[in-house]
Amino acid sequence: MQKTLLAIALLISVAASAQSSRYTEAMQKNISLLDSAKSVDQLLSLASTFDRIGDAEKTQWLPYYYAALAQTWIGWMPATTDKDANAAKINAYLSKAEAIEKNAETYAVENMAATQQMLVDPQSRWATNGKDASAALQKGLALDPNNPRLYYLQAMSLFNTPSQFGGGKDKAKPVFEKSIALYKSAQPKPLYPTWGRKQAEDMLAQCQ
């Protein structure tokens, strides 16, 4: 009886290990594709792929996060004219991720989705989408005050805010510098996000 139980336990362990290996390989492959994706079609395909991985795994938030991130990159493209509809897709993926785990990375994407909506008409949307973007940053920083992507996004907001409203290059520069310092010292877990460092460095150069 004891040998039978040990054999069953061993089979379960081997099966779990194989499933974990397949998940890791699939994620690594598609994260690499996301890093090099340039078209809306590529990004849409990747968003769907990550969503399917998440649905298959059921307990992993990262696939849904990357689905939302792919949809977010679509939102920055000029061809994406309906920012509200795109943001709804982003937030649907984020809801799946946050049902498993709320963390700073999902709030970074939430910030970008709200920012894209706000930029449709900054003057009229600042009080709604602008506040949502700011709130997402604050929630993320409360969970992880050393997240470099959150400071990069905060610096971007300052950079694009007129000086008479508390923004400008002078205000953005030290926040970009903090972001870059945190990127340099970061030790992300396997499969965790690493994007943003080059963008932060490029923007800092514009603040000189």
Residue ranges and their predicted role:
Residues 125, 129-157:
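A contiguous pocket-lining binding segment that forms or flanks enzyme active sites
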Residues 170-174, 178-208:
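Terminal, low-structured helical/coil segments at or just beyond the last alpha-helical repeat
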Residues 56, 99-100, 143, 182:
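Structural marker of alpha-solenoid helical repeat scaffolds
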Residues 84-133:
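Hydrophobic, well-structured mid-protein blocks that either form specific transmembrane helices
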Residues 53, 96-97, 139-140, 179:
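Canonical positions in the second alpha-helix
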Residues 1-26:
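Bacterial Sec-dependent N-terminal signal peptides
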Residues 35-49, 81-93, 126-134, 173-178:
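Helix-turn-helix repeat elements of alpha-solenoid scaffolds
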Residues 20-32, 56-78, 101-121, 147-161, ...:
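Amphipathic alpha-helical repeat scaffolds of TPR domains
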